[in-house]
Amino acid sequence: MSNKVHVKKGDTVVLLTGEGKEAGKKGKVLEVNTKDGTVIVEGMNIVKKHQKPRSQYQQGGIINKEAPIHASNVMLVCPKCGKPTKVRRRILENGEKIRECKKCNGTIDVIREAKK
């Protein structure tokens, strides 16, 4: 069962909660997991992974990587007004489905093209 997530890959989001210094930071969504309702944001929630060498030629060590964040802890930043906002989905008269900013009513992007 997949859950609807209000952000897409490539969106700019702001972190609402986090480890003190990370709250309020902006980043780009790298990956969305609808099954778990989580997102991976560039430069946020960095964890250290201890990795063993898998082959004779690969080097092991400690790797920094982004960990998933629950989608409820991020908010989309509107590309038009630049403010964190909730997302409204709307179907226009011509059948086009869009994502819209609730603060400035600007179109964020088109989800589905108009039916011909």
UniProtKB/Swiss-Prot annotation:
InterPro entries: Rib_uL2_dom2, Ribosomal_uL24, Ribosomal_uL24_KOW, Translation_prot_SH3-like_sf. Gene3D superfamilies: 2.30.30.30. Keywords: Ribonucleoprotein, Ribosomal protein, RNA-binding, rRNA-binding. GO terms for biological process: translation. The keyword RNA-binding applies. It holds the Pfam family ribosomal_L24. Part of the 50S ribosomal subunit. One of two assembly initiator proteins, it binds directly to the 5'-end of the 23S rRNA, where it nucleates assembly of the 50S subunit. Belongs to the universal ribosomal protein uL24 family. This is Large ribosomal subunit protein uL24. GO terms for cellular component: ribonucleoprotein complex; ribosome. GO terms for molecular function: rRNA binding; structural constituent of ribosome.
